[in-house]
Amino acid sequence: TRVSAPLFVRPETGLNDNLNGVERPVSFGIKEQNDKEVEIVQSLAKWKRYALKRYGFAVGEGLYTDMSAIRRDEETDNIHSIYVDQWDWEKIIDKSDRNEATLKEVVRKVYEALKNTEKYMASRYDYIGSILPEDITFISSQELEDRYPDLTPKEREYKAAKEYGAIFIMQIGGALKSGQRHDGRAPDYDDWSLNGDIIVYYPVLDIALELSSMGIRVDEDSLLSQLQISNCMDRLQLPFQKAIMDKELPYTIGGGIGQSRICMFYLRKAHIGEDQSSIWPPEVVQEAERNGILLL
């Protein structure tokens, strides 16, 4: 079921995505409400789970929405913008389905849709060929570290994506054997043992390109554990996190599919600004113009 997405939320609800815990949300006061502060969303990861409960969805049912977010502290480049647009989705599952088999089943469905869309684009435009492999390869972040211990996480992603064409890197957020994390994840939405990213090899830029991030969401046990690890126990006082601990919210799986990312991929563009209107440093705009690239 498609639903309307909020552009801003109240910070005291705990519904905004804190990302890695250091990115500052954009906030402003509402004049009519005595300048009560609200925050522009950074993602809808938590809000979607809350909405499923509030709207009365049942096990096996879900929602999707058209999300727009602003990430003011994003380090921009060819594939990163301060403006984030995603197809966001969330589905209620039974607690017994909080397992890797459920995650992989959903990943395969999302990948099948991505692959079929590429085939359609290739049939319509001569310059676009199908480059996605028939099947996606599953690999854990620890397996990547074991295989490439001397490389950075991003370098490992590139190696694996180039080898397999399309990969789903599982278990992102927790510490690996080296003590380092593969990548940061907020401790209060994804279960770090049951999440991951769909990443494809993108020959236009010779990079590993993340198209989607998803995961089975925390239950009361994994939330407590991850908040302890992240030294964020104060969040247990917020309504959203408290509702999880009190088992008032449904168990869910959810994720986001980057709209501009997949447009960039399907159209074989060199910069995300070619299919998304945002603001870029002047030197980036000038360099793009020198290379015949129009940033919207």
Question: Residue locations for each model-derived region?
Answer:
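A translation/RNA-centric and nucleic-acid-associated enzymatic feature enriched
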Residues: S68-I70, S141-L296
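A general structural signal for short secondary-structure junctions and capping/turn motifs
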Residues: N18, G29-K31, K53-V59, I79-S81, ...
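Alpha-helix initiation and N-capping motif
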Residues: A45-R49, L63, Q86, E100, ...
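Short connector loops at helix/strand junctions that flank enzyme active sites
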Residues: D35, E61, V84, Y164, ...
